Amino acid sequence: AHMDAKFRYGKSKQEIMEFIYDYLYVDDFAANSIYEYFVEQYTYAKIPSNQRLLIEYYKGFGDRRFVIFHSLFGRKVNDALSRAVAYIVARQYNTNVTISISDNGFYLSAEGTLGGLEAFKQLTPENFKNILTQSLNKTETLASRFRHCAGRSLMTLRHYKGEAKSVGRQQVRGKILLKFVQEMDNDFSILKEARREALEDYMDVNNALKVIELIANGQMEIKTINTIIPTPFAFNLVS
């Protein structure tokens, strides 16, 4: 928000460089690189911030489409947001969705129609956790967390009669047990703990929910742009 405001109010390069020095404690070369990076983003499009979620539509080679969310909330929050949005897109358009995340954003990619903004707007403070929980089903993330929880609760054994079970065998047995538990009781305590670890430890569902609440309350705006080539901030994600 600070950098965007300085560009909008026409601050000089020297003034912005001084702000970068005070804010980051970097040398001249690094400060100039940061300045030029932001100049390119501001000139070509818009600068995202903690008050603005920037959504960028970009069409790649062939019919591959990208929806890039410039969300500056950290990898764990972006992981949660991306999974929830991708789940809605996959279910609504019956398509396979590719996800890539970073500390400063994430993208969804698919062949054909990809309603990223429309899917994101379906997320509310009331349904977000439920949708994210549903998106974990049949994922390697939940299977891995469940295997660890099952091992700690002695549902599966790493050693039996003095022999160590291979990781591969533990993974196979863990997935079989997970499928059985999901069919038997979706509220099984070990399954609930595996979901909790995935949502709260592996991801950051609580702060992701705060982002949804900020948007719902009008405290964070959403801006969309269409680009022929990705913006400078998007290159690290799509390249």
Residue ranges of model-derived segments:
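Extended, highly charged accessory segments
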Residues: A1-S239
